[in-house]
């Protein structure tokens, strides 16, 4: 009999979730599957923008499927023609921008089934990924 972790189980495992590239003008959205609970340790993604002049601001949003539970908007603007790595982790103390990498603190999160992790980017233009 196979035992897999569920929200009623004391078992758990470290798992990396890799989504497909959402493509131009699309945002990231991951949903916790049914009968699962995710304990989030870190979130890591890239945003590549084209030459369209605009300062974009990236937000990371955690919701319960309908209502926002946690949201952070990066204070550092993401300019045109730029490839920036965004990293949210429990080890970061404050927001920092270092060599096209943006680091942000992440609270301890335990998400039930149906909860979502998603991004929202202001002024996302054609060619931005």
Language model features with spans:
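Beta-strand-centric surfaces of beta-sandwich/beta-rich domains
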Residues: 2-129
């Amino acid at each position: 009999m196979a035992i897999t972790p569920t929200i009623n189980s004391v078992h758990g495992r470290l798992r990396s979730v890799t989504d497909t590239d959402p493509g131009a003008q699309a945002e990231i959205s991951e949903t916790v599957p049914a009968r699962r609970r995710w304990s989030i340790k870190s979130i890591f993604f890239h945003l590549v923008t084209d030459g369209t002049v605009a300062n974009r601001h990236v937000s990371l949003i955690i919701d319960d499927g309908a209502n926002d539970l946690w949201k952070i908007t990066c204070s550092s603007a993401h300019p045109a023609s730029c490839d920036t790595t965004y990293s949210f982790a429990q080890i970061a103390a404050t927001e920092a921008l270092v060599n096209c990498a943006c680091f942000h603190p992440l609270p301890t999160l335990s998400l039930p089934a149906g909860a979502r992790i998603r991004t929202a980017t202001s002024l996302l233009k054609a060619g931005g990924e």
